[in-house]
Amino acid sequence: MPNFAGTWKMRSSENFDELLKALGVNAMLRKVAVAAASKPHVEIRQDGDQFYIKTSTTVRTTEINFKVGEGFEEETVDGRKCRSLATWENENKIHCTQTLLEGDGPKTYWTRELANDELILTFGADDVVCTRIYVRE
């Protein structure tokens, strides 16, 4: 079983602004979000298939608790409430599909994968994909 536990700092980010654009976030809010999310701090606790993930930026902190294979509620990148289901895509990668609780929007998901001592986080909105690479602190 892979060990996602630890504190992580972001090393690189690709397509975050494009992702927010695909989610319908206006230009002013995108500018603030991109600046605020430029140095997120991520804490992950793991007990087998049970995960706690806390992501902190200068303007927002999110926390999720979930068990792989069981549905849970969280928020999309742009703050809309959704029902999510995380599954193991392979032995080192979790894939989570999100379904909005209200309204319409693009199909969203996230993945977290361990590879070469890095945590690779992807967010997707329809065909737009944002990739963020983290290293352990």
Swiss-Prot record:
InterPro entries: Calycin, Fatty_acid-bd, ILBP, Lipocln_cytosolic_FA-bd_dom. Cytosolic CRABPs may regulate the access of retinoic acid to the nuclear retinoic acid receptors. GO terms for molecular function: fatty acid binding; retinal binding; retinoic acid binding; retinoid binding; retinol binding. It comes from Homo sapiens (Human). Pfam families: Lipocalin (PF00061). Forms a beta-barrel structure that accommodates hydrophobic ligands in its interior. This is Cellular retinoic acid-binding protein 1. It is found in: Cytoplasm. All-trans-retinoate binds at R132, I133, Y134.
